[in-house]
Structure formats: structure tokens, C-alpha cells
């Protein structure tokens, strides 16, 4: 994501410059360090989420409604790492967009779509955990595979329609003085939000779903506390299931918290920037964008830390065991984890 000031600093658009990139003031060592850090994040994002995708798709034991949502969220993070972060890395390090205006809009549309898609997925996961913990008797009838597929359709279609519609219609730039001049600069990537669409993006794309998530998880943990007081008096099989559901909710709650921590500064800056006459420093805007990207890097690390089955699946994938016939029926859970 770019800001208006970032474009002004990169190009002398007010005087219709020749569209060439300015000389990069960063030393070779600084650029090498930036490339190394960002490339490392990209590798972890792509590889980690690819492992999650393969694991849930391959092992039959993981074919549950909850994991179907997690699988789709991993696809979102994988696409961000594969299609968005590499081009953003070049732009951030070189201080220039080399890929043209049309691809700039496509890139930004996917960037915006995937970030909103992530939060929609987290809302869906929160709903899934709500029924599993707060209404366990109705979970199997409420969160069926067809219901999850409809949720996923909403998670992908609504952010996609919003992102591509707003960016390609250029409604986001209505009333921004100098925008047409920025477009005339061939090497710029002039995407910024006016007051109306900056507010709309923040409220509809971040604040509202985030508030819903926080409210749902608040209810989940309140119910979990009540369950903890009576859990010892329940039958063993019901006791074990409630413990597993609570642990899953805790892990996914951490995923939600990391997402909000990583993306709130960027979305909040998009909200404030037009009210501050687009005065956000370019380096700050870029740093906040990458802080948001790093959320997709963190997710597979969180899964690896909290889910032993993820680590086992990774080992099986690296050893090539998934190419053996019938290996997809392998049990990924130990006796202790199923109790």
C-alpha cells in the first residue's frame, strides 16, 4: 500500500517529470539487508502456508469444518506471499514502482482484497468456535461443510468485489488534488484513499469485523470459564472434547490477536492520512504495510508452536511420505492429544 506523500517524494509530478526513478539514497549494504529480511519473510510465508495447505488437503483426519476455514485462510496468506510481497519488496527497497500503472492497480487490488479476506476468515473461524464451545449440541448441525463453503464464498467474493471495484473505478481518489498528475507519471503507483473511502475501508473492512471477532471471543472465553468449573463432573468423552475445543479457541484467538496487532496501524493510517492532508511519511507508511504483511509470516509459526500435528505433517512432507499410497489415512494425533 502506498501513500500520496510517498509518490510525491519519489517523483516530481507537480512539474510533470519524466517518470524516471530518482537515485536510490540507500547504501548497498542497507538494501542488501532489506532484501534479506524481506526475502526471508516471503520464504517463510510461502513455505509455511504451503505446508498448511498440503497438510489439511492431504490428511483425511484434518478434513473438518474448522480446518477447512484454516485451509482457506492459509491460501490467503500464501497468495499474499507469492503474488504481493515480492513486488512490494522491490518497491520498498528501490523506492520505485517498475511495473506500470495497470499492474499497480491489479497489485493493489489483490493486496487490499487479501487483507480484508483474512479478517473475514477470522470472523468465520470465530463463529465456528462460538458454536463449538457455547452451543456444542448444535455444532454438528450449524457448522456443516455446506455452511462453511457458503461462508468461504462470502469471505472471498465480498472483499474481491470491494477491492477491485473501488480501485479500478478510482472512486477512492475522487476529490484528491493532483491525482491526475500523479497518474501522468509513468513510473508512479498512485493509489491513495480520500476521506470517504478511507473511512469506509476502515469501518467496513477492519473495525466492524474486528469488533465482532473480539465480542465473539469474549463470549467464548466467558463460557470457557464456566465450563472449567464443571468440567471434572462431565463424562470423560465430553470432558476431552471440551478441552480440545477450548485449546483450539485459544490458539485461534492468538492468531486473531496477532492479526489485529499487525494490521491495525496500517488501516488506522489509511483512515487518518486524508484528514492530515496526506502527510504520512513515506517510510512510516511502508513500514506499517510490511508490519501487516508479517502477519501472514507469523501464522504458520503460530500453528507450528501450538499444533503438534502441524509439526508431524511437516516432517512427513519433508520425508516424502505423503507420496506413499494410503498414507493420507495416517493418524497425526498422539493418544494424549486425543484425550
UniProtKB/Swiss-Prot annotation:
Origin superkingdom: Eukaryota
Keywords for this protein: Cell membrane, Disulfide bond, G-protein coupled receptor, Glycoprotein, Membrane, Receptor, Transducer, Transmembrane, Transmembrane helix
Record-level GO BP terms: G protein-coupled receptor signaling pathway
Disulfide bonds: 21-185, 104-189
Molecular function (Gene Ontology), one example: trace-amine receptor activity
Topology within the bilayer: Multi-pass membrane protein
Segments on the Extracellular side according to the record's topology features: 1-36, 89-106, 172-195, 273-287
Main location, first listed in the record: membrane
Glycosylation sites: 18, 277
Cytoplasmic side: 58-67, 128-150, 217-251, 311-339
InterPro entries: GPCR_Rhodpsn (IPR000276), GPCR_Rhodpsn_7TM (IPR017452), TAAR (IPR050569), TAAR_fam (IPR009132)
Pfam families for the chain: 7tm_1 (PF00001)
Signal peptide: none
CDD domains in alphabetical order: 7tmA_TAAR2_3_4
Cell location: Cell membrane
PANTHER family to which the protein is assigned, alphabetical: HISTAMINE RECEPTOR-RELATED G-PROTEIN COUPLED RECEPTOR, TRACE AMINE-ASSOCIATED RECEPTOR 2
Domain remarks: In addition to the well known disulfide bond common to G-protein coupled receptor 1 family, trace amine-associated receptors (TAARs) contain an unique disulfide bond (Cys-21-Cys-185) connecting the N-terminus to the extracellular Loop 2 (ECL2), which is required for agonist-induced receptor activation.
Cited function: Orphan olfactory receptor specific for trace amines. Trace amine compounds are enriched in animal body fluids and act on trace amine-associated receptors (TAARs) to elicit both intraspecific and interspecific innate behaviors. Ligand-binding causes a conformation change that triggers signaling via the G(s)-class of G-proteins which activate adenylate cyclase. May also be required to provide olfactory input into limbic brain areas to regulate emotional behaviors likely via modulation of the dopamine system.
Family statement: Belongs to the G-protein coupled receptor 1 family.
Protein name according to UniProt: Trace amine-associated receptor 2
Organism of this sequence: Rattus norvegicus (Rat)
Amino acid at each position: 500500500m502506498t501513500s500520496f506523500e510517498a509518490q510525491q517524494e519519489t517523483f516530481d509530478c507537480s512539474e510533470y517529470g519524466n517518470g524516471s526513478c530518482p537515485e536510490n539514497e540507500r547504501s548497498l549494504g542497507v538494501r542488501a539487508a532489506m532484501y534479506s529480511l524481506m526475502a526471508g519473510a516471503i520464504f517463510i510465508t510461502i513455505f509455511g502456508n504451503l505446508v498448511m495447505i498440503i497438510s489439511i488437503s492431504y490428511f483425511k483426519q484434518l478434513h473438518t469444518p474448522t480446518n477447512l476455514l484454516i485451509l482457506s485462510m492459509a491460501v490467503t496468506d500464501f497468495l499474499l506471499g507469492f503474488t504481493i510481497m515480492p513486488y512490494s519488496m522491490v518497491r520498498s527497497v528501490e523506492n520505485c514502482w517498475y511495473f506500470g500503472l495497470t499492474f499497480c492497480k491489479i497489485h493493489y487490488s489483490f493486496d487490499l482484497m487479501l487483507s480484508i479476506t483474512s479478517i473475514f476468515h477470522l470472523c468465520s473461524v470465530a463463529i465456528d468456535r462460538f458454536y463449538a464451545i457455547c452451543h456444542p449440541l448444535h455444532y454438528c448441525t450449524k457448522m456443516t461443510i455446506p455452511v462453511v463453503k457458503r461462508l468461504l464464498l462470502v469471505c472471498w467474493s465480498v472483499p474481491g468485489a470491494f477491492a477491485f471495484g473501488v480501485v479500478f473505478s478510482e472512486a477512492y481518489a475522487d476529490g484528491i488534488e493532483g491525482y491526475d498528475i500523479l497518474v501522468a507519471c509513468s513510473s508512479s503507483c498512485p493509489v491513495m484513499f480520500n476521506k470517504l473511502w478511507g473511512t469506509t475501508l476502515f469501518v467496513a473492512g477492519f473495525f466492524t469485523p474486528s469488533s465482532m471477532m473480539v465480542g465473539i471471543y469474549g463470549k467464548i472465553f466467558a463460557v470457557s470459564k464456566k465450563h472449567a468449573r464443571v468440567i471434572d463432573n462431565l463424562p470423560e468423552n465430553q470432558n476431552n472434547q471440551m478441552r480440545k475445543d477450548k485449546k483450539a479457541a485459544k490458539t485461534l484467538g492468538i492468531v486473531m490477536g496477532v492479526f489485529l496487532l499487525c494490521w491495525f496501524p496500517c488501516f488506522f493510517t489509511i483512515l487518518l492520512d486524508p484528514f492530515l492532508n496526506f502527510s504520512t511519511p513515506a517510510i512510516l507508511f511502508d513500514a506499517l504495510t510490511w508490519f501487516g504483511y508479517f502477519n501472514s509470516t507469523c501464522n504458520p509459526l503460530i500453528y507450528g508452536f501450538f499444533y503438534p500435528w502441524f509439526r508431524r505433517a511437516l516432517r512427513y512432507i519433508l520425508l516424502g511420505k505423503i507420496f506413499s499410497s494410503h498414507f493420507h489415512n495416517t493418524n497425526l494425533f498422539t493418544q494424549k492429544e486425543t484425550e
